[in-house]
């Protein structure tokens, strides 16, 4: 995953230096942008060359901040117990292809990179359980939604260890 390697590289850079991160996953754009924002670094942009995405991130301060973990975490078991409750919404922030191959029944898919522009689709009256593959993207999504006043819970460990019913749309 580009973020893990980027974190290691950022620790070796001087403030103001720029790192290029190459990836082929379209979801890496949203992941790196959200991570950079949450750690105080500056996401400069992406250049697409064929199937390769070249992301650029500038180290903004002398010490990289750790991305804060969202304070409210629930387990997969909790989500399974409440998934049919009309006062809850399961929000899957994985990429569309990931969601299509396997997702929690009734979950709504808004990829992390689209969350900011599609936030109006969410109901502020509902408790939103945010899920991704491992809890990293959902953590970033929870921070964004919490800042906008939503009642959110980060689902850990997420789809990587989901043992309950799933749906497939492909």
Region locations from a protein language model:
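An N-terminal amphipathic alpha-helical segment
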Residues: 1-13
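Rhodanese-like catalytic fold shared by cysteine-dependent sulfurtransferases
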Residues: 5, 33-89, 96-127, 136-170
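A short alpha-helix capping/helix-coil boundary motif
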Residues: 10-14, 119-122
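Short glycine-rich, basic-tinged beta-strand/loop micro-motifs
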Residues: 12-22
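Short, structured protein-protein interaction patches enriched in aromatics and acidic/basic residues
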Residues: 21-31, 37-39
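Residue-level detector of alpha-helix initiation sites
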Residues: 27, 133-136
